[in-house]
Design a protein with these regions (language model features):
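Glycine-rich phosphate/pyrophosphate-binding loop and the adjoining helix
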Residues: 201-232
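Helix-loop-strand module that forms the ligand-binding subsite of alpha/beta enzymes
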Residues: 111-201
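Extracytoplasmic entry segments of secretory-pathway proteins
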Residues: 3-6, 16, 20, 40, ...
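N-terminal beta1-alpha1-beta2 submodule of the flavodoxin-like/Rossmannoid cofactor-binding fold
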Residues: 33-143, 155, 225-231
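N-terminal export signals
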Residues: 13-34
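Active-site-proximal beta-strand/loop segments in catalytic clefts of secreted hydrolases
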Residues: 66-67, 104-107, 149-151, 178-181, ...
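Short, surface-exposed alpha-helical segments at coil->helix boundaries
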Residues: 83, 87, 91, 158, ...
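N-terminal secretory signal peptides
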Residues: 1-9, 24-25
Length: 232
């Protein structure tokens, strides 16, 4: 009799614990990329799945990024950026690790207007365009890890990133995406880079909301440490 009472009590305890866990999960705020300006949230890293995900950094590192200054989105409004959000993030990364840096620049510069840039980006996506890159491309020989940085617009990286990745040989390179965004995180970079960086190994990426990039130092450092970078 005592054994049955003890068993029943234990089952009730387990049931109460399960219910409390479920309630907690439902009531916890979901962390999204659209936090308010005064919440001062630390940006959350986003994991990049891929056909060979799970790679760690190794060897000599190249950081290649595309960034756009000018009028930009800011919590539903507009603001002017002297330095684009992705470049701010790239500089923070460069300050922490030993790497070479290559800035991806278009032959046909994007408009200063945010809305005009959005429209052009959509047109290029719909046309599956390959915007031309100004200057020569870097040689990947000698590099084992490549950081790829870009903004995210209309849920994916600008098409100029595909221009870049399709023209280089990423076989056996470790590819590490990082992005700045309004609300789409890493977007479709996992799928897109898996298609264009054939034979690459993919490490965990990081997405930072554009408005929050100025105070993302802690998140960037934690991410770089987590995927195996030696800090400068």
């Amino acid at each position: 009799m005592h054994q049955r009472d003890h068993t029943a009590a234990r089952r009730r305890t387990i049931l109460r614990a399960a219910l409390l866990t479920g309630v907690t999960a439902m009531t916890m705020p979901h962390v999204t990329s659209c936090s308010s300006a005064d919440e001062q949230q630390t940006p959350e890293p986003s994991r990049t799945p891929g056909p060979t995900a799970g790679g760690g950094v190794r060897g000599k590192v190249l950081l290649a990024y595309f960034s756009r200054p000018g009028e930009n989105y800011y919590y539903g409004e507009r603001t002017h950026l002297e330095v684009g959000n992705t470049e701010v993030m790239a500089r923070k990364i460069r300050a922490l690790i030993d790497c070479d840096v290559y800035r991806i620049e278009p032959v046909d510069a994007y408009p200063a207007s945010y809305d005009a840039t959005v429209k052009r980006n959509v047109r290029e996506q719909q046309a599956d365009a390959r915007p031309a890159i100004k200057g020569g491309l870097p040689e990947l020989d000698g590099y084992e890890t490549v950081l790829l940085g870009s903004p995210i617009g209309n849920v994916r990286a600008p098409m100029i990133m595909t221009t870049f990745t399709e023209q280089l040989d990423f076989a056996n390179k470790t590819v590490v995406p990082f992005t700045t965004h309004a609300m789409s995180g890493l977007g479709t970079t996992a799928r897109d880079y898996a298609d264009s960086c054939r034979g690459a190994i993919f490490a965990q990426g990081l997405a930072v909301q554009g408005e929050e990039v100025g105070k993302a130092d802690r998140a960037i450092r934690a991410w770089l440490n987590r995927i195996g970078f030696a800090m400068a």
